[in-house]
Amino acid sequence: MTTGLSTAGAQDIGRSSVRPYLEECTRRFQEMFDRHVVTRPTKVELTDAELREVIDDCNAAVAPLGKTVSDERWISYVGVVLWSQSPRHIKDMEAFKAVCVLNCVTFVWDDMDPALHDFGLFLPQLRKICEKYYGPEDAEVAYEAARAFVTSDHMFRDSPIKAALCTTSPEQYFRFRVTDIGVDFWMKMSYPIYRHPEFTEHAKTSLAARMTTRGLTIVNDFYSYDREVSLGQITNCFRLCDVSDETAFKEFFQARLDDMIEDIECIKAFDQLTQDVFLDLIYGNFVWTTSNKRYKTAVNDVNSRIQ
């Protein structure tokens, strides 16, 4: 990718790092999933032709923004979709490919310096993707969810609202992240994959997003903490504790594990297919995060700021 490594707001992550806790916390996440979810997610396998179609559509969508993205970076982005959907219930592979493309191109937007954002160029590309892969009604829902996500990402980059919600309490923080982490968008572009009436309604009302936000965000925040500190970003729940204080960190981490367990146990009240989709998303995101290059180092060629 044609990108430089941003140093704006960079901090000394040697003084503020979760690296000392990496092995123990990964073990505790895994034990929690083994105990409360049990069924390990499986990866959706795209054919070479399907992957090439996805990457070509991704390249076409971001080309108007003047950036070239490597296949390696696209494959890093698409991994979360391959691991976090529910392959045993997929009924529409065209909708699945739509999620692959929309996920990847909005990842680029999220990783991009906001000075490069151009709604007039990018939104028509999102609409084109939706109209290619979905029927008319679902295309409109997916497009509006995509538009809302990229608009929110742009408007909250340096917002006092974001600062207040991200630095006050876990409750305020997770309220903000329902939209900011993209899970509401995810659900509204994903429901056509399954053609399941109950899940469709939970996606459209945003209950699906609210049920899975903490399970996604806590994992994402732990493994992206060092990167986000290095870039001066505040959107991380572990900023709400002193990670250099081992006792304080462990208490905070346990509270967040308890949040995840509470949500997972409540998810078990939903119908079986909806349960599977929710839990495959939360658990699959953990599998992807712990195996993906994006989270291996604070800054590398698949997670660096696009400038």
From Swiss-Prot:
Effect of D113E: No change in product (cyclooctat-9-en-7-ol)
Keyword DNA-binding applies: no
Cofactors: Mg(2+)
Cofactor note: Binds 3 Mg(2+) ions per subunit.
Outcome after substituting W288G: Produces 3,7,18-dolabellatriene
Similarity comment: Belongs to the terpene synthase family.
Note: 3,7,18-dolabellatriene produced by the Trp288Gly mutant has potential antibiotic activity against multidrug-resistant S.aureus (MRSA).
Protein name: Cyclooctat-9-en-7-ol synthase
